């Protein structure tokens, strides 16, 4: 059987060790004779899963004690609404950094609940898209919070700086880059992340929220999106996505076994440098993002001759290199190389790219 590498942007590749363990435990979890999918979320067995997964996540990210960790439904899109409805309080404006497709999607949703101060931080120089340094962002004085997306999956644009905005409440959509490297949680008021890219399977959303921000929700906010309600009920106000929670917990343990986020940072940098090096080597492939803002997680690229795209994708698929088609908005190709992607997968891709260029360049 051909070795398959899944470059999907999400739902994305999971560590093979996690999949093997889940397969082994699927029908007889912890000797219970049932699957983890079948047991009560309030059973002592699943409560252990919940407690261990939170502890492991706190260890990985070094989450301070004054932050709550919530395991939620709804994906990042639900948080586009939950953030303003939980954090606005008596204010009517928030700063929204517009750096790409997903940041703009959050802005569009927030417009239903407040007047976003939209700050476009993109730059375009010599055909390359980049992001202004944070010190140039024109933040307002009366905003309830500052929202931004550190990694844009579609355009492959990353904001690698950590925020330093004094006492402003910073909210970040870390859906596609959480757990890829260490970050300083104390610089943020809220971090949220859909699980299906760099955590686990689709269906779970993580929210990390500073305790002093709880209890400010709009009266019309549905309880299922109320951070205080979720925190007071240990993320079990209603039945949580138990299987996704369990698998994410296995991923957290796998990350710790691999050496933690410092080790992930080294691996992810090495994978990204290998792939960008292959793209930059000649003019056959190209990436249209400024070097300082290139994403380690999502690498879009195009060919000088776009008529070769379909052939590239079909031949790549035949070689076990799956899900390389670019997003419908951007076209071209895109390789998503999250934590679970081994460097062998990136090497297989770059070898194929070099061979394809030799034959069609």
Curated annotation (Swiss-Prot):
Report residues binding L-glutamate.
42
Q: Which cofactor does it need?
A: pyridoxal 5'-phosphate
Q: Subunit structure, per the record? A: Homodimer.
Example GO molecular function: O-phospho-L-serine:2-oxoglutarate aminotransferase activity
Look up the record and name the pathway of this protein: Amino-acid biosynthesis; L-serine biosynthesis; L-serine from 3-phospho-D-glycerate: step 2/3; Cofactor biosynthesis; pyridoxine 5'-phosphate biosynthesis; pyridoxine 5'-phosphate from D-erythrose 4-phosphate: step 3/5
Where does this protein reside within or beyond the cell? Cytoplasm
- Per its record, how is this protein called by name? Phosphoserine aminotransferase
Tell me which family the UniProt entry assigns to this protein.
Answer: Belongs to the class-V pyridoxal-phosphate-dependent aminotransferase family. SerC subfamily.
Carrying N6-(pyridoxal phosphate)lysine, the residues are 197
Binding positions for pyridoxal 5'-phosphate? Answer: 76-77, 102, 153, 173, 196, 238-239
Q: What is its EC number?
A: 2.6.1.52
Q: Which reaction does it catalyse?
A: O-phospho-L-serine + 2-oxoglutarate = 3-phosphooxypyruvate + L-glutamate; 4-(phosphooxy)-L-threonine + 2-oxoglutarate = (R)-3-hydroxy-2-oxo-4-phosphooxybutanoate + L-glutamate
Source organism lineage? Answer: Bacteria, Pseudomonadati, Pseudomonadota, Gammaproteobacteria, Enterobacterales
- What's in the keyword line of the UniProt record? Amino-acid biosynthesis, Aminotransferase, Cytoplasm, Pyridoxal phosphate, Pyridoxine biosynthesis, Serine biosynthesis, Transferase
The domain of life is: Bacteria
Q: What is any one of the record's Gene Ontology cellular component terms? A: cytoplasm
Broad EC category: transferase
Asked whether the keyword Transferase is assigned, the reply is yes
Q: Mostly located where? A: cytoplasm
Q: Which residues form a coiled coil?
A: none
Which biological processes are named by the entry's GO terms?
L-serine biosynthetic process; pyridoxine biosynthetic process
């Amino acid at each position: 059987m051909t070795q398959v590498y899944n470059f999907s942007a999400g739902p994305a590749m999971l560590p093979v060790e996690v999949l093997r363990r889940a397969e082994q435990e699927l029908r007889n979890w912890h000797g219970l004779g049932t699957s983890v999918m079948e047991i009560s979320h309030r059973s002592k067995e699943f409560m252990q899963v919940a407690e261990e997964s939170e502890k492991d996540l706190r260890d990985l990210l070094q989450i301070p004690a004054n932050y709550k960790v919530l395991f939620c439904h709804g994906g990042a899109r639900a948080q586009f609404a939950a953030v303003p409805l939980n954090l606005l309080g008596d204010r009517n404006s928030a700063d929204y950094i517009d750096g790409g497709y997903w940041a703009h999607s959050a802005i569009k949703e927030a417009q239903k609940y407040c007047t976003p101060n939209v700050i476009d931080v993109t730059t375009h120089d010599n055909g390359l898209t980049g992001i202004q340094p944070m010190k140039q962002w024109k933040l307002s004085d009366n905003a309830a919070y500052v929202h931004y997306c550190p990694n844009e999956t579609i355009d492959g644009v990353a904001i690698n700086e950590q925020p330093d905005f004094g006492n402003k409440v910073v909210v970040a959509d870390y859906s596609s880059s959480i757990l890829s490297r260490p970050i300083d949680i104390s610089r943020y008021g809220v971090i949220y992340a859909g699980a299906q890219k760099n955590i686990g399977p689709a269906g779970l959303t993580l929210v990390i929220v500073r305790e002093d921000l709880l209890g400010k929700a709009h009266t019309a906010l549905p309880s299922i999106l109320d951070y205080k309600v979720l925190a007071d009920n240990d993320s079990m106000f209603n039945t949580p996505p138990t299987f996704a929670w369990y698998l994410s917990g296995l991923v957290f343990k796998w990350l710790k076994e691999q050496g933690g986020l410092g080790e992930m940072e080294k691996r992810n940098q090495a994978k990204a440098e290998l792939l960008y090096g292959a793209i930059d080597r000649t003019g056959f492939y190209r990436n249209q993002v400024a070097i300082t803002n290139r994403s380690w997680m999502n690498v879009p690229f195009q060919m000088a001759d776009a008529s070769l795209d379909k052939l590239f994708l079909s031949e790549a698929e035949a070689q076990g290199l799956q899900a390389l088609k670019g997003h419908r908005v951007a076209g071209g190709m895109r390789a998503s190389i999250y934590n679970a992607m081994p460097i062998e997968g990136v090497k297989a891709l770059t070898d194929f790219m070099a061979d394809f260029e030799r034959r069609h360049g």
